[in-house]
Amino acid sequence: MPFTLGQRWISDTESELGLGTVVAMDARTVTLLFPSTGENRLYARSDSPVTRVMFNPGDTITSHEGWQLHIDEVKEENGLLVYVGTRLDTEETNVTLREVLLDSKLVFSKPQDRLFAGQIDRMDRFALRYRARKFQSEQYRMPYSGLRGQRTNLIPHQLNIAHDVGRRHAPRVLLADEVGLGKTIEAGMILHQQLLSGAAERVLIIVPETLQHQWLVEMLRRFNLRFALFDDERYTEAQHDAYNPFETEQLVICSLDFARRNKQRLEHLCDAEWDLLVVDEAHHLVWSTDAPSREYMAIEQLAERVPGVLLLTATPEQLGMESHFARLRLLDPNRFHDFEQFVEEQKNYRPVADAVAMLLAGNKLSNDELNRLGDLIGEQDIEPLLQAANSDRDDAQAARDELVSMLMDRHGTSRVLFRNTRNGVKGFPKRELHTVKLPLPTQYQTAIKVSGIMGARKSAEDRARDMLYPEQIYQEFEGDTGTWWNFDPRVEWLMGYLTSHRSQKVLVICAKATTALQLEQVLREREGIRAAVFHEGMSIIERDRAAAWFAEEDTGAQVLLCSEIGSEGRNFQFASNLVMFDLPFNPDLLEQRIGRLDRIGQAHDIQIHVPYLEKTAQSVLVRWYHEGLDAFEHTCPTGRAIYDSAYASLINYLAAPEETDGFDDLIKSCREQHEALKAQLEQGRDRLLEIHSNGGEKAQQLAQSIEEQDDDTNLIAFAMNLFDIVGINQDDRGDNLIVLTPSDHMLVPDFPGLPEDGCTITFERDVALSREDAQFITWEHPLIRNGLDLILSGDTGSSTISLLKNKALPVGTLLVELVYVVEAQAPKQLQLNRFLPPTPVRMLLDKNGNNLAAQVEFETFNRQLSAVNRHTGSKLVNAVQQDVHAILQLGETQIEKSARALIDNARREADEKLSGELSRLEALRAVNPNIRDDELAAIDSNRQQVLESLNQAGWRLDALRLIVVTHQ
């Protein structure tokens, strides 16, 4: 190689050294100094792994003093290059810059610069980069983005609500599904969509204290959303890092009590500029016209400041009209400002609901009914639609569906309130109760008697709680030496039940963690029963492992022993046997226990076993729950109301179980109250709202479409390719499970989303649902999204050289494969990727500029090519540099037409879609006041900004591959 002192070269094998300068040479060796690192390298002159750095007219270069030069001309003087051009900071022309004075930290970012500088990537990395571009672009445009990646069953009514609400600007809605229908999952899906699309970045979730960990677990395990839990300690710590502690995290969960308790803390919460606020158990926010509660006022303050609000609440009818109005008032105080007016309005919706019922029944409509429909809809040109709906023509059903849709749009609260009921949703199992009456051991009788004497001053409530758990009373007196499990007949019964049902999975729930731990030891030591334990003292990872062991079919635990708090937020639909070792204090907790198994998607009827001790509070409670509330075999929406009204009497019976006088009357009166309230709820059902919330056929199709996308084999192939190239170890464990672990030779030292000790993954939704320790990999999973970002945000795979063995072409024939990206820059919240995601345009050019890409498909072509090592590649590039420059010029002239077509299509699609949405809502605004002005303004502003951004769209070369034909 011809070396001259002062020339600039770059190392082919150590490009991180930057630009080197020739500082010494003799007949056989050359020495390069790399000023940016201060290191020297000695190379053999004849075959050194270095590439001469030469820039061309049109390039911009940086001097060692930091100023930049746009090159107009390149001269050579005594073997050294001199660049002549315009200095960018002073705009001075004819400025010269000798190559020896170039900035040594020069980074080659353009693919062509990297190629000419000898920074040649492996061929498989180029292929991965192209696939990453192609798949990322496709995924951005796929329908239902944000709904495909969560670890949940594809349940139509949940998907319907999430799809409707998740795409809105700053949604403000009330989610009021009945228990067991998945409000938390619906909220999570909405959050996931909003965060993934960029519509929201900062989210605050406020929940009752007992549900904080449940939400934390659900958001992480189901949606891969890592929330920070703020309590007093965390808040104090964060004060050291920021004036407003809540600005240290993007996603925050805190309790309602924590938010309300301290005035400054509430101010900090209000000032933290959240995009979305989620409030669970919103029915506990007490409001009246004269005296709203402090909790209500705290949430009201936040709701005034946060653009998007999701309130999760029990069914509205359970709580009374005023309570329901109070929640709607939080969502839109301008619209819901007068309670009397609201009550009147609700009455006026009855004809609308009747009209919908009429259409759905499918019967022929009378002239009066047709006229009533016309009046209700109030649209011009509705006559043909009414005639079609009332005919025997093929389009009759479609016309009826359209009329129902038009009525829905005019229905008062359909945009702000969603409520599904078990009556309207199929897929729930039956619940069967099996009570087992057992004698009270003498040891317990003695302990209870002594406790009664010593605790005479205790309140009735405290005595009632004690009487529910006689083993705790006994243990208190006996201390560590007390072995209640040796004589408690419930333990004997449990062991007998488990040994006679060894093939069945059984969930056992008890109130206390200590009880669960003691039972596990007894079952293991006495009968060798495999039992996993699950309690609040365990970390999330430990609970995951316990749940996974329980979920394993053949080698897993037969029984899972849960404490009351430990089981929150976990569902075990694969089991259908529930044993309640004791009973909880109130009907909400009872429903929560049964709800661990009684979820939508449960395949079997649920067998509920309650072994109880006679003459204890358990014997009182089991009768009251079953005979008074029917709470074991059916969900009990009336439970809380009756519990509150019967509380004083019930507590006395629980505190003194032997006093049974009048208990039958209490049960009878509670049952009558239950039946009356239930009938009242049924009568008050809003059928129209249920139809709207349920989604009907549309929701079924949505679930089916996502299920079809689950079968995308491209994902598995791409993910494995990505893991191979990044350097992540993969260990196939069978059962559709793969263990990923970091290796010592990864592309990056710390791959985002991959724990240090690795993780288990699956591509199968069913496996992910039964194995909580396995992460469900989809295109939306952080591992894949981070992998795409890692490849595409850097220069991995952006320049390479390959050989094509093809005797039909002359040896030395050049082809250049160019991958351009057409894109527009815009703030994430505009969601520009719906219309123009970064889109790859592939070209395969010969030296005459003929584009062969349409005839030669990428994957087929890629398989015909072979790799070249970097050193040989650098020599090839130097030999054909001028030809490659010429082909690149031809590519630049051809890309404009393709790019312009893509941009024009995107602009047309965006205008049609956003203008259509705006027109539809503006037309509806006239008949439905629940469409907010700020929502209309946001859509209009969004449309203008999107079109403006698309006008600024451009293109750039993202990757190139030089292909040289050989016959060997």
Swiss-Prot record:
Coiled coil ranges: none
InterPro entries, A to Z: Helicase_ATP-bd, Helicase_C-like, Helicase_RapA, P-loop_NTPase, RapA_C, SNF2-like_sf, SNF2/RAD54-like_C, SNF2_N
Quaternary context: Interacts with the RNAP. Has a higher affinity for the core RNAP than for the holoenzyme. Its ATPase activity is stimulated by binding to RNAP.
GO molecular function: ATP binding; DNA binding; helicase activity; hydrolase activity, acting on acid anhydrides
Gene: rapA
Keyword Disulfide bond in record: no
Known role: Transcription regulator that activates transcription by stimulating RNA polymerase (RNAP) recycling in case of stress conditions such as supercoiled DNA or high salt concentrations. Probably acts by releasing the RNAP, when it is trapped or immobilized on tightly supercoiled DNA. Does not activate transcription on linear DNA. Probably not involved in DNA repair.
Binding site for ATP: D177, E178, V179, G180, L181, G182, K183, T184
Species of provenance: Salmonella paratyphi B (strain ATCC BAA-1250 / SPB7)
Enzyme Commission designation: 3.6.4.-
Domain of life: Bacteria
Record Pfam families: Helicase_C, RapA_C, SNF2-rel_dom, Tudor_1_RapA, Tudor_RapA
Start and end residues of each Helicase ATP-binding domain: 164-334
Recorded family membership: Belongs to the SNF2/RAD54 helicase family. RapA subfamily.
Domain Helicase C-terminal residue range list: 490-685
Protein name: RNA polymerase-associated protein RapA
A biological-process GO annotation: regulation of DNA-templated transcription
DEAH box, short sequence motif: residues: 280-283
Assigned keywords, A-Z: Activator, ATP-binding, DNA-binding, Helicase, Hydrolase, Nucleotide-binding, Transcription, Transcription regulation
Record's keyword annotation contains ATP-binding: yes
